[in-house]
Design a protein with these regions (language model features):
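Active-site hotspot residues in diverse enzymes, especially metal/ion-binding acidic/histidine motifs
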Residues: 1-165
Length: 165
């Protein structure tokens, strides 16, 4: 789980503290690179008391739908929940030609697969949330290539938010 998180987070290069939309788009680009195909994220309202995310694997790309009413940091958690399902699906299953693969709807929150996906989504949310909450003027705000950039990324991974003034 941590290896996948590292594989998705390591390529992300955004100014920290990050604009939530910029971080979200950078994560989507990283997921697309990891998948080796485009991942299109759509925002839509889900009916109350139902799912907050959905993944459809198409012939040439993936569609992920996240609840538009969720805060962006929560949309990151939802997206990463769906990414975990992408990671766990057997790669050798052929898709019906011209149609999306069958959708596995969550029927039981206690299913081990759903708990793993939730755990991964929360892990990613925790690790990336610190990129949003970092105060300006810390090492996290260094430009890519700046020697402080590495220190900032380490600090972000450890949830370090700088000294209080």
């Amino acid at each position: 789980m941590r290896r996948l998180a590292d594989a998705l987070i390591d390529p992300i290069r955004v100014r920290v503290p990050a604009d939530p939309e910029v971080l979200f788009e950078a994560l989507v680009a990283s997921v697309s690179a990891w998948r080796g195909r485009e991942v299109h994220v759509h925002r839509a309202a889900f009916p109350p008391h139902t799912a907050s995310g959905l993944w459809l694997e198409r012939d040439t790309h993936d569609d992920v739908v996240v609840d538009e009413r969720a805060a962006v940091w929560h949309q990151i958690v939802i997206l990463c929940h769906e990414v975990w399902h992408m990671n766990r699906r057997p790669a050798d299953e052929p898709a019906p030609v011209g149609r999306p693969r069958p959708v596995a709807a969550r029927t039981d929150f206690s299913l081990a697969e759903e708990q793993e996906a939730d755990k991964f989504g929360m892990l990613m949310g925790r690790r990336l949330r610190s990129w949003l909450d970092t105060s300006a003027g810390t090492a996290h705000t260094a430009e890519p290539g700046d020697p402080q950039d590495l220190a900032g990324r380490i600090g972000a991974a450890l949830n370090y938010r700088g000294t209080k003034r």
